[in-house]
């Protein structure tokens, strides 16, 4: 049975990805220890994989016990809403530390295991990694950088499959925070309507589709938006 490590597994999209891959893969549920991660592990019968993408030692410890890894899903991410003039350098550093540098560091640490399995690396990017919208300055910049890293990895590691997925707005806690920010700056009512957004399960299904594509196919990118 192939193996899959999912970062940010306790989140809305992460837990949906875990559920989507559970029937076909041995899972490692990556993330900081939390009751939510423990509950997901119990529900799926999969081990938690303690991981802090801002801590180099945590990344090395998580990677060193895996000799082979078939699938790595980079799902962890942070968002600090704000226009350029509102932002502060610390938010930019924090955005890049998790969204880019953490993903790069974990990929490098797991590269021997991925090469050994001729594995697949999936990056959960964002529509913000293709087009910049007001109030998404540091997040968009980090997602554009993540897209470039995925493209570089694909070019430099021909034995691996590398897929970037660019979901539009998805019903998650991060989305609720973004809507609250947008409502505050526009004096809106702040009403959150999940029906306007993609379901996490929809994004997870696309991950499963990419991962389960036969060996003769290599899915480079998937773009999906709310219908």
Which residues fall in each region the model found?
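Conserved glycine-rich cofactor-binding loop
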Residues: 10-11
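Residue(s) in the substrate-gating loop at a strand-loop-helix junction
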Residues: 126
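Conserved glycine-rich Rossmann-like NAD(P)H-binding loop of the short-chain dehydrogenase/reductase
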Residues: 24-39
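C-terminal helical subdomain
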Residues: 160, 164-167, 183-227
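Substrate-binding pocket helix/loop in short-chain dehydrogenase/reductase
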Residues: 83-84, 91-93
């Amino acid at each position: 049975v192939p193996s899959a490590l999912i970062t940010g597994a306790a989140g809305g999209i992460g837990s949906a990805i875990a559920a989507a891959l559970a029937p076909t893969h041995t899972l490692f549920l990556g993330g900081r220890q939390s009751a939510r991660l423990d509950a997901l592990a119990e529900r799926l019968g999969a081990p938690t994989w303690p991981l802090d993408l801002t801590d180099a030692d945590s990344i090395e410890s998580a990677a060193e016990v895996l000799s082979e890894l078939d699938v790595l899903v980079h799902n962890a991410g942070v968002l600090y809403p704000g226009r350029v003039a509102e932002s502060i350098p610390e938010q930019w550093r924090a955005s890049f530390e998790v969204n880019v540098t953490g993903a790069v560091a974990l990929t490098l640490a797991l590269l021997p295991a991925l090469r050994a399995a001729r594995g697949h690396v999936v990056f959960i990017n964002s529509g913000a990694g293709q087009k910049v919208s007001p109030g998404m300055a540091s997040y968009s910049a980090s997602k554009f950088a993540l897209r470039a890293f995925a493209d570089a990895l694909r070019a430099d590691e021909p034995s691996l499959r590398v897929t970037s997925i660019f979901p539009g707005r998805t019903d998650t806690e991060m989305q609720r925070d973004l809507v609250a920010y947008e409502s505050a700056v526009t004096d809106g009512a702040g009403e959150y309507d999940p029906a306007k957004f993609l379901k996490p399960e929809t994004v997870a299904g696309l991950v499963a589709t990419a991962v389960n594509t036969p060996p003769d196919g290599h899915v480079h990118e998937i773009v999906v938006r709310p219908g």
